[in-house]
Regions:
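Peripheral/terminal regions associated with large enzymatic or DNA-binding modules
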Residues: 22-123, 128-361
Length: 361
């Protein structure tokens, strides 16, 4: 297969990536681009790629962070072998880093790279397993809302599993998960990697008021300040701030389309599954559904507020008693399993928060 080496720059760093044209016997099934982010976990990546392989998207963007040390190389090479088992007609772009950047800024870098080459794209991490309907769902709605500035992203993960009371296949919300999502270049081009809105007092005051009025996470602005001070772009806070500053809405499927299988001992963001509070464990065991097409589209673009209430309760935003209860539950579970290191870590974090010393890194 022909391969072309290209070079692209990110904030003064130059990285080589390749563009491969796969001409196999099976045709592409869905005309959409998919970005896959992975590192060194072949077992979970295999499950994600199996679904991508069934869906057969027309374009693939493959981003892999580089090794921290020699011990990472076995997993890194195993992951590369998995994602290169492509047996359908597909244009494949690869960006494999030579050094380790970590989740941040890798998330930001990979997505800016993919959206510089595609005007709309699906994003999947190596622990996010989609249903087959997810690809068709995203394709149809990426086209439908391509030029609608009110819509910021299309989500795949529904924290309700199935949202009651909605007579359509999706609805609109101002809260969302990044466990499987899609968006447009028009949105990514607005991402403010330098957090310049923090230099505008009126914008900061507006965001402060919105966070209070919506009972959003109270530490959001401090998180943005910490991320700016760290001098590297953090995708999640950049995405959320862009959505808030633009009064954007997300498309949410009425039925969940994603499984997250990332709650393992070696995961970056989550503690061991068995020591999670019960409600959070449920997020990792939800059923994913297949939709019936054609989709039933809502007539009006208006936020469905009951979902926001469910979402806030799931993450204990604006629910201090629920948060305290979960902290106690987590402490008891860690005691039960003898996870004293996690207990010390959690206590240290809470003490730092009480003293105003906690920083988001």
């Amino acid at each position: 297969m022909p391969t072309h080496a290209l070079r692209c720059g990110f904030a003064g760093r130059t990285t080589c990536f390749t563009l491969k044209f796969y001409k196999m016997t099976h045709p592409a099934k869905v005309d959409v681009a998919v970005l896959m982010l992975f590192f060194n976990r072949p077992d979970s990546l295999q499950k994600v790629f199996n679904e991508v392989k069934k869906a057969r998207p027309a374009r693939l963007f493959l981003y892999q962070d580089g090794p921290r040390n020699e011990n990472d190389m076995e997993g890194i090479m195993a992951c590369r072998h998995i994602v290169e088992e492509i047996d359908w007609v597909c244009d494949v772009h690869q960006l494999y880093q030579n050094r380790n950047y970590g989740c941040d800024p890798s998330g930001f870098m990979s997505q800016k790279w993919a959206f510089s080459l595609a005007d709309k794209c699906i994003v999947l991490e190596d622990d996010v397993v989609p249903s087959q309907s997810f690809f068709t769902f995203c394709k149809e709605l990426l086209d439908r809302y391509e030029h609608d500035e009110r819509i910021t992203m299309i989500a795949g993960f529904n924290t309700d599993e199935q949202t009651p009371g909605v007579p359509y296949d999706y609805f609109f919300t101002s809260v969302f998960s990044i466990w499987g999502w899609a968006s447009w270049r028009r949105v990514v081009d607005k991402w403010d990697e330098h957090y310049t809105f923090l230099d505008h007092p009126f914008a900061v005051q507006q965001l402060t008021d919105i966070v209070k009025q919506r009972r959003y996470r109270a530490d959001f602005l401090q998180m943005c300040r910490d991320h700016k001070a760290n001098g590297k772009p953090y995708f999640e806070s950049i995405f959320w701030s862009t959505m808030l500053l633009g009064s954007g809405l997300a498309v949410m499927p009425t039925q969940n389309l994603i499984n997250n299988i990332g709650a393992t001992d070696d995961s970056t963001h989550y503690s061991a599954f068995r020591t999670m509070p019960k409600r959070l464990r449920r997020l990792f065991t939800m059923q994913r559904f297949e939709l019936s097409f054609p989709l039933r589209h809502p007539k009006y673009v208006i936020e469905y507020l009951p979902y926001k209430a469910h979402f806030y309760r799931a993450f204990a935003w604006g629910h201090p008693l629920i948060k305290v209860g979960r902290s106690i539950e987590e402490l008891l579970l860690n005691l039960r399993y003898g996870n004293f290191r996690q207990i010390r870590k959690s206590l240290n974090r809470r003490i730092c928060k009480w003293l105003g010393l906690h920083r988001h890194v």
